[in-house]
Amino acid sequence: QLQVELLKCLKASLNNQLGIDFLAARPEVVGILALNFGSEDVFICTQALELLAVLMVDGPEGYRAVLAAMDYFKLVKGERVRFYSLLDALMTDEADLAFKRDVMLFINTLVNSAMDIEERIEIRADLIYTGILDAVERLKNQSVDVFMEKVS
C-alpha cells in the first residue's frame, strides 16, 4: 500500500513542468521508479510505466533518464537483454489485455521518443532481438479471440 501511495505522490508531482524537471534530473530516482515494473501488482506496474512515459516525452533529459533506468532494471533483475521484462509482460498468459495494451503504449513511446534515428534503430533492434515481433503477433491473435468470445 505504501508503494501505491508513493507512486501517487510521484504522479501528482509530474502534473507540472517543475516536477517533471526535478525527477528527470535525478536518474537514480527514475531507476527506482523503473524497478516498480517488476512488481507482482499490475496496478503498480502500470503506474510505473505511465510515469516513465511522461518523462520520456518531455525531452532529452527525461528520455535519457528512462533509458538509464531500463538499463538499471536489466542489471538489478539479471536480465540478459534490455527490455526483456517488457516482452515477458506481453508473452505471459496471466496478464490481461488491458495491461498488455499499456505495455505496448510504453514501448511505442520508447521508440517514438528517441532523440535521433540511430537511437531509434538501436532500441528497435533491441526489441526485435527480445522477440517483440512474435509477442505482437500473439497479442493480435489474443485480441481477436477475446473479441470473438464477446461477440458469440
Please provide the spans of the model-predicted regions.
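Extended acidic/polar regulatory tracts at the flanks of large eukaryotic scaffold/adaptor proteins
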Residues: Q1-S152
